Amino acid sequence: AGILWAGFVLKPAPRLLYNPSVSAAIGWYIVEPLKVAKRGDLVASRLPGHAESLASTRGYLPAGVPVIKTVWAVAGDRVCVDAGVLTVAGQPPLPLLGQDRSGRPLPVWTQGCTSLRLGEILLISNETPESFDSRYFGPVSLSHVIGRAVFLGDISWHTPDEREASDW
């Protein structure tokens, strides 16, 4: 029984997350294990400490809440930031905003070009250019990635009376 329990603890069941942010489609996601992160994967991830602190302080996201973002670049990719634009070979250029919606300056994590190291990825929102993502806090360690995020939809809950009325 101890061995079975240990195996269960080491391989947790997929998680269910609700995303209320416009940085990814609003709704429910199941989070599945992810062995290798590839460009284009939608993932649930914790933010690096400095980014989590800033996001929490500014009210973007409570501390400890995961984000859902797209893997934009992986280890070995050359990432450049120049004149307020982030570029990665094979990806469309992304503008960097100078300030957030409240007029506060956004951080710039690098100037010039750098190559992502083994175990690093860039996480970007495909949904909104105003997302707080790797454009502002830089690479994320794969150890922060919880898993692949699979969109289930925005499930609405209705009382039996509402459901019957909406069926007509």
Residue ranges, per PLM feature:
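Soluble "head" domains of membrane/secretory-pathway proteins
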Residues: 2, 6-168
